[in-house]
Design a protein with these regions (language model features):
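Gly-rich Lys/Arg/Thr-decorated short loops/hinges at beta-loop-alpha junctions or inter-strand turns
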Residues: 2-9, 69-82, 141-151, 178-181, ...
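Short glycine/serine/threonine-rich phosphate/pyrophosphate-binding segments
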Residues: 15-25, 49-50, 93-94, 114-122, ...
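Glycine-rich beta-alpha junction loops
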Residues: 43-47, 141-145, 187-192, 216-222, ...
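N-terminal phosphate-binding or glycine-rich loops at protein starts, especially the Walker A/P-loop
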Residues: 2-54
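Glycine-rich oxoanion-binding loops at beta->alpha junctions
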Residues: 52-106, 115, 154-156, 168
Length: 410
């Protein structure tokens, strides 16, 4: 059989281990020289590919340099938020497949979240419609953990570990003074509260901070919130409150919208960051106590020093599994994670495949049964689910300047 080439791209927001998934795809591709001649990367995703921006991994990261991807945050290939047209009759599709043919592409991999799986779906369906032999596989990633038909997603474990660690650190700082205070920590999550729920992992004992955790899966009532804080002050001096950026009231109005400064992004979506600051001002004005807000922002997804070893290993495994599946003829699929336990009841994960058409444009939220009846905490079921995903540490090499050493695209 004549050799063909493999191409891989990254899309959407980066994670601490999206480059580990990339490493898995590339390293596995390079172990099949009798079948795969070149392993190419799309610079800035499908959008960059349309503008002929590609690289050859054997030239860009030769030898041991490739392994540097596994401790490098961000997206080595760069990203994009380009959405392919809904109609497969659009001229962009024959243009893409003409480029694939010119590069002798036999396997296409896209690492990303929901919109990226939408791209995988469209490309695989178009390939089938024209009888193209190109295999199209999706590699999951998202710190939001909101992809359906998979136990969890690469990136969530490391982000959850960062959130829990940071919340624990903020708690120790807040406990310094014996003066009533409320610290509100705003965490990423528009519709799904998985990452905010992970703040519960910071607790060392029952009754420890964070005392309140608010997710977008449950409506937020400002008056009840203030009453809950007042009651908590009867036993506690310093209160830590963790909120998802997407919390909303019973009418569906985002809490951040009560701040008149909230704007919209280039897609017309409301810019949700700001609910923490709004609640800070609300607490200060209504309760008359010291209040501050902390927005974790992009640090949740780019911390290399707190990468979960479990998350990293699973991301690499997903990349390798996807290549093996594509070489076996699979297409139009996303690599999924299936949770298992060994004979001693310990956590294990195996990779599987799911029809990407059943995944794109769907969203997995935190089960309501994992949220306490009062709406401001998570149950032990969530703790058992999340704790295995943050286990283990990795060693990030340091440069001569004493700072983490990453690999960069030239």
């Amino acid at each position: 059989m004549a050799k063909k080439n493999l191409i891989v791209g990254q899309s959407g927001g980066p994670t601490a281990v999206i480059n580990s998934s990339l490493y898995g795809v590339v390293s596995e591709g390079l172990t099949h020289p009798d079948t795969i001649e070149h392993v190419y990367g799309m610079v800035n995703g499908i959008e960059g590919f349309l503008n002929d921006r590609i690289l050859d991994f054997e030239e860009a990261l030769p030898g041991d340099k490739l392994k540097g991807l596994t401790h490098t945050p961000g997206a080595y290939l760069g990203s994009c938020r380009y959405k392919l047209p809904e109609s497969l009759e659009d001229p962009v599709y024959p243009a893409l497949f003409k480029k694939f043919e010119e590069l002798n592409i036999g396997w296409f991999f896209y690492i990303g979240g929901n919109d990226s799986m939408d791209t995988v779906s469209k490309l695989s369906r178009y390939a089938a419609s024209i009888g193209s032999p190109i295999r199209v596989i999706g590699e999951p990633k998202t710190i939001d953990n909101d992809l359906v038909h998979t136990d969890h997603t690469p990136g969530f474990g490391s982000a959850a570990k960062y959130v829990a660690s940071t919340v624990r650190e903020i708690t120790t700082d807040a406990n310094v003074y014996e003066k009533r205070s409320v610290t509100i920590i705003e965490i990423m999550g528009r519709h799904a509260g998985w990452l905010t729920a992970a703040s519960a992992l910071a607790r060392k004992y029952d009754g420890d901070n964070p005392l309140f955790i608010y997710l977008p899966e449950v409506a937020f009532d400002q008056d009840v919130f203030l009453k809950d804080l007042e009651k908590a002050f009867e036993k506690n001096c310093n209160l830590i409150v963790c909120v998802s950026e997407g919390i909303h009231d019973a009418d569906g109005t985002f809490i951040c919208e009560y701040d008149s400064s909230v704007g919209t992004d280039t897609f017309g979506h409301k810019m949700l960051a700001g609910c923490g600051k709004y609640l800070e001002n609300l607490v200060r004005s209504r309760l008359g106590v010291k209040a501050r807000s902390v927005e974790l922002n992009v640090s949740q997804r780019c911390s290399s020093t707190l990468i979960s070893a479990t998350d990293q290993q699973e991301a690499i495994a997903a990349g390798r599994f996807g290549v093996q599946a594509a070489l076996d003829g699979e297409t139009g699929k996303m690599v999924s994670f299936i949770r298992q336990t060994d004979s001693e009841g310990n956590y294990q994960m195996v990779c599987g495949l799911e029809d990407v058409n059943a995944i794109c444009n769907e969203e997995k939220t935190v089960p309501l049964t994992w949220i306490t009846s009062d709406g401001h905490d998570v149950t032990e079921d969530f703790i058992r689910y999340a704790r295995p995903l943050i286990q283990g540490n990795i060693e990030v090499p340091l440069g001569e300047d004493g700072l983490p050493k990453f690999v960069y695209r030239k």
